Every structure is written in structure tokens, then in C-alpha cells.
């Protein structure tokens, strides 16, 4: 077939314009987690600089068009919504892991968004997926050109299929495609909610409720909803972004676990460290009970009750009963979680060459309907 030089020249242009020329041997950008906000800012500087001057809805659909990407939303990408989106780097058929053709005659520069994303998840989730694919196009073309030039098999030179579930494998076992997915997954929400503008708007809104430290959990939920509407992202994306930016009280707003919201809660400032929480899915609690001997002893002692997806001291000050007679958190407990609840650390695995520095990598336990479901310890 011969190799088209168009992708090669596009890659040359990208490398010349990029001020981060740190690439792995496979031409994957070397980006550490603490550089993600900078990556998002560079993307917006190039494609939508006005989004760095005022809090606004980032027109990611227009950006995709300006990047000469064609967006198609009428092709299901998997049987069970395993993939939200796919971006095509070279013409041809796209195969799944069983070598079954999922997209025929795909064209370079095409983004496929599964049509079920909007109505089974949210429009905000669709926008995050599109930002994810745009970042792939912006930063990950060199790898795909290399794969084509060396004659790599399967999809490696053609497409990235973007799964909703983060990779649960240890990061030191990740392949290049998995590192590119990690980069795009974490940069995408930062593109839609750039750090400086999100802080500006969040502080402005929280000031009407007494400020960052004094605002109630209800106030934080109102602010999250206003940010979600302004930036046109999902509620959970807005919450997670606030937490990323250091608004720790947002942890207690709109807790979503095991497919449902539980009641919001508050706690003393400083009670939770980074990547800590009072909320844990039932499956993760059960896993800890089965595999951690000391934790099993703690549960078996009867000192704690698992209710509302929190592990709470078994004391009438903190435990109330609902009309059905089931244990639930008391109103006092909901405003003093640091007094009565076990703190869980979100699970991490370590390192890799694609980050450039030793850094921890966040994982999700399974396919989740929200952007921040993780494994706990």
C-alpha cells in the first residue's frame, strides 16, 4: 500500500510546535500527573485562548472542527458501552480484542462517539469524551505514525479505543496505549474546566456562602451544580475537579457510590488528606474484610457499623434508626464525620517511564458511571 507522508508531516509540525519534546522510545509524551493542568492550558492556548481569560463553556465541538476532526455519533462501539469513544489515526477497519471488526472503512481524523453516552450517562460525559479524543489527536500522533512505519499489527497504528474503566493493572506493566489513555483521561476534564478559571468562579460562588472554609455542604452542592451548568460538564466531573484543585470540603458533596447518591456530609478542615475519603463501596469493604486480617478484627469487634456506605462508630450519638428500623447516620454524625468514621485511602499503584518522575497513579475498581470511582484500602 505504501506509506502516506501526510501523517508524518502532521507529526513533524506537532513536534516543532510543542515545547515539551520529552518522548519515550515509542514517541509517547512523557507527562507526569502534576503537569496535566499545564497540558490543558497549552491545548487551550492553541485552540481556545479565550477560555483562559474568563470562566466559560469550552466549545469543544468547535475545537474538534477546527482541528479538522469529523465527529460521528451514530455507531455503537461495543455491545455493553465498554468504549465511549474512538479516534482514527489511519484509514482502515477497527478491530476489537477478539479481532472482530467494530468499524469498517474508518477514515483518518474521525472521532466516533457512542450514541448511548448522552442518554445513558450525560451530555457532560459526551463532552469530556470528545475532549479526550481531541487531546489524543493533539499529542499522540507520533506514536501512531511510528507504529505504521514499523508495520505494527492490529489497531496500534490505526486507532485508540477509549474505555470507560481505567486500567486496573499495575502501572509498571502498562503499554504505550495505556499510558496515552491515562494522559487523555486526566487532561480532558482539565481542558473543559481550566484550573485558573475554575478557581476564580468557585471562589466567587463560595464567597456568597461565607467562603471556602465556612460554606456548608449544601452550599458546596449548589456551587457544584452551578459550575456543572456553566462549564457544561457532569455533576461528578465538577465535584472531582474541585477536589483536584484543593477544595477538600467538596468530598462530602453529592457522594455517589454503588450506583446511588448518599447523603452529603461535612467534617473538620484537614481531617482528610489528599485522596482520602469517608465513603467506600460495599465490594471494596468486603474485599478489605476478606484480605486484611487487622481490618477483619476491627469489623468483627462490633465497634463499627457499616451504614450509608460509611464505617461508623457504633454509638447512639452517631447512629440513628430510620422508619424501617435500619441503621443510618445521625444528623450530628453527618456534620462531624471526622469524629466517628473510618478514613479510607484511595488505591494507588506506582511509577513508569511515561511519567518521567516517580509518581503515583490512580485506578478505578471497575466500569463506573462517574469519573472518580476508585479502589480503596
Question: What positions do the PLM features span?
Answer:
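Active-site hotspot residues in diverse enzymes, especially metal/ion-binding acidic/histidine motifs
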Residues: 1-377
Amino acid at each position: 500500500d505504501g506509506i502516506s507522508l501526510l501523517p508524518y508531516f502532521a507529526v513533524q509540525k506537532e513536534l516543532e510546535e510543542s515545547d515539551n519534546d520529552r518522548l519515550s522510545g515509542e514517541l509517547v509524551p512523557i507527562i507526569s500527573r502534576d503537569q496535566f493542568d499545564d497540558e490543558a492550558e497549552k491545548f487551550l492556548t492553541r485552540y481556545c485562548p479565550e477560555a483562559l481569560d474568563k470562566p466559560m463553556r469550552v466549545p469543544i465541538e468547535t475545537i474538534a472542527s477546527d482541528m479538522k476532526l469529523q465527529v460521528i455519533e451514530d455507531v455503537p462501539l461495543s455491545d455493553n458501552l465498554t468504549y465511549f469513544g474512538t479516534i482514527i489515526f489511519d484509514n482502515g477497519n477497527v478491530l476489537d480484542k477478539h479481532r472482530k471488526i467494530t468499524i469498517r472503512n474508518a477514515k483518518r481524523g474521525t472521532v466516533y462517539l457512542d450514541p448511548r453516552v448522552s442518554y445513558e450517562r450525560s451530555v457532560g460525559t459526551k463532552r469530556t469524551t470528545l475532549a479526550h479524543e481531541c487531546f489524543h489527536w493533539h499529542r499522540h500522533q507520533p506514536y501512531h505514525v511510528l507504529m505504521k512505519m514499523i508495520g505494527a499489527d492490529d489497531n496500534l497504528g490505526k486507532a485508540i479505543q477509549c474505555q470507560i474503566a481505567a486500567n486496573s493493572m499495575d502501572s509498571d506493566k502498562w503499554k504505550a496505549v495505556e499510558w496515552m489513555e491515562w494522559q487523555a483521561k486526566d487532561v480532558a476534564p482539565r481542558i473543559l474546566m481550566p484550573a485558573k478559571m475554575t478557581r476564580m468562579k468557585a471562589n466567587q460562588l463560595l464567597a456568597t456562602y461565607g467562603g471556602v472554609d465556612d460554606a456548608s455542604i449544601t452550599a458546596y452542592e449548589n456551587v457544584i451544580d452551578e459550575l456543572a451548568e456553566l462549564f457544561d460538564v457532569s455533576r461528578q466531573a465538577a465535584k472531582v475537579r474541585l477536589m483536584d484543585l484543593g477544595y477538600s470540603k467538596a468530598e462530602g458533596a453529592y457522594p455517589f457510590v454503588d450506583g446511588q447518591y448518599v447523603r452529603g456530609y461535612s467534617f473538620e478542615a484537614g481531617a482528610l488528606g489528599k485522596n482520602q475519603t469517608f465513603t467506600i463501596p460495599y465490594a471494596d469493604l468486603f474485599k478489605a474484610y476478606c484480605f486484611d486480617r487487622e481490618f477483619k478484627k476491627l469489623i468483627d469487634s462490633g465497634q463499627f457499623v457499616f451504614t450509608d456506605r460509611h464505617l461508623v462508630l457504633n454509638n447512639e450519638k452517631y447512629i440513628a434508626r430510620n422508619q424501617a428500623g435500619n441503621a443510618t447516620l445521625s444528623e450530628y454524625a453527618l456534620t462531624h464525620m471526622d469524629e466517628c468514621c473510618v478514613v479510607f485511602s484511595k488505591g494507588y499503584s506506582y511509577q513508569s517511564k511515561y511519567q518521567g518522575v516517580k509518581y503515583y497513579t490512580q485506578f478505578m475498581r471497575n466500569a463506573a458511571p462517574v469519573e472518580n470511582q476508585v479502589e480503596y484500602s
